[in-house]
């Protein structure tokens, strides 16, 4: 009977984790460059004889690789990335990756995010431009030109998020594994004058949220019933002495 409680508890913990990720996804359905968090669950077998009992793992989080819709803005300092790559930014918590390409220039010409975090080049250094040196043009390879002269290169990075990651400021993420600059990949490029919208389908996520909430309530009710049955069994056994 206790085994049933353990199985229900493992299911409840897994469902709670999925509820939290769904709620976070929905909250960021309008966040530029946001990538949804998904959860993969595995079946864990308990070595109980004479039969094996299946438990639900707590779940492993991973980032959705689906690209969000592209929105044309026409701004010279708005950028979207084509393909599986990220911009690198220097946050107070350390370097982070983002697909939110809403950039601007400081008074000194440093390229920063709308929150003021420096945007980094392929070498991990801040990008310095001249705000008064003419039109800014950025090629698909990330090369930044002013008056026909290349003066900087937007850093594009790839990372293995399967080794773990943490969120930073909604659309930014910090992978556990060291990101590497993108080299010789023709499927990756920069699009100037565009932004990538969140890849969250709010309607789909809401539907899943309702389903998971119902499942969570059902498991909770099952646990209460199991606990009640266990109490009655203990009471009966105790009274038979």
Curated annotation (Swiss-Prot):
Compartments in which it is found: Bacterial flagellum basal body
Classification via InterPro entries: Flag_bb_rod_N, Flagellar_FlgE/F/G, Flg_bb/hook_C_dom, FlgE/F/G-like, FlgF, LlgE_F_G-like_D1
Origin superkingdom: Bacteria
Alphabetical UniProt keywords: Bacterial flagellum
Chain segments annotated as transmembrane: none
Keyword rRNA processing (UniProt): no
GO biological process: bacterial-type flagellum-dependent swarming motility
Family statement drawn from the similarity comment of this UniProt entry: Belongs to the flagella basal body rod proteins family.
Assembly: The basal body constitutes a major portion of the flagellar organelle and consists of five rings (E,L,P,S, and M) mounted on a central rod. The rod consists of about 26 subunits of FlgG in the distal portion, and FlgB, FlgC and FlgF are thought to build up the proximal portion of the rod with about 6 subunits each.
The protein, known as: Flagellar basal-body rod protein FlgF
Organism: Rhizobium meliloti (strain 1021) (Ensifer meliloti)
Taxonomy of the source species: Bacteria, Pseudomonadati, Pseudomonadota, Alphaproteobacteria, Hyphomicrobiales
Name of the coding gene: flgF
């Amino acid at each position: 009977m206790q085994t049933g409680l353990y199985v229900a508890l493992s299911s409840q913990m897994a469902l709670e984790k999925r509820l939290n990720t769904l709620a976070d996804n929905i909250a960021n359905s309008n966040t530029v460059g946001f990538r949804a968090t998904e959860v993969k669950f595995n079946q864990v077998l308990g070595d109980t004889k004479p039969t094996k009992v299946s438990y639900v793992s707590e779940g492993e989080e991973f980032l959705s690789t689906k690209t969000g819709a592209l929105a044309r803005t026409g701004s010279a300092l708005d950028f979207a990335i084509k393909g599986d790559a990220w911009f690198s930014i220097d946050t107070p918590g350390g370097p982070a990756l983002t697909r939110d390409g809403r950039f601007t220039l400081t008074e000194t010409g440093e390229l920063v995010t709308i929150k003021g975090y420096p945007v980094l080049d392929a070498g991990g250094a801040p990008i310095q431009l001249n705000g008064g040196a003419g039109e800014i043009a950025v090629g698909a390879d990330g090369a930044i030109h002013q008056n026909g002269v290349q003066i900087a290169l937007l850093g594009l990075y790839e990372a293995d998020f399967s080794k773990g990651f943490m969120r930073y400021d909604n659309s930014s993420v910090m992978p556990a594994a060291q990101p590497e600059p993108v080299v010789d990949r023709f499927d990756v490029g920069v699009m100037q004058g565009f932004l990538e919208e969140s890849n969250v389908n709010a309607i789909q996520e809401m539907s899943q949220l309702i389903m998971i909430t119902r499942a969570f309530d059902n498991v909770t009710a099952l646990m209460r019933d199991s606990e009640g049955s266990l109490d009655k069994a203990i009471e009966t056994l105790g009274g038979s002495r």
